[in-house]
């Protein structure tokens, strides 16, 4: 599921497996699912990266992102620092 976090950064560390990771572009059929969270079915016009064991990705708040073409198993660890102030658009 494609998503955008309005106040969270994702720091992703891949532990095992491979996946295609898409960032940027526009979330297709995006809808709010929780405060500060938008999810959709895909991303249109994003940039594509191939991730594998040992890769680290930092996804800033407000940047659409999506895992696709995911191997099994695909294991990753994510830390989500949350923005505490400023604009809450």
Describe the role of every protein-language-model region.
Residues 1-4:
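N-terminal secretory signal peptides
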Residues 6-27, 33-42:
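Short, conserved beta-strand element in jelly-roll/cupin
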Residues 71-88:
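A short hydrophobic beta-strand segment most commonly corresponding to one strand
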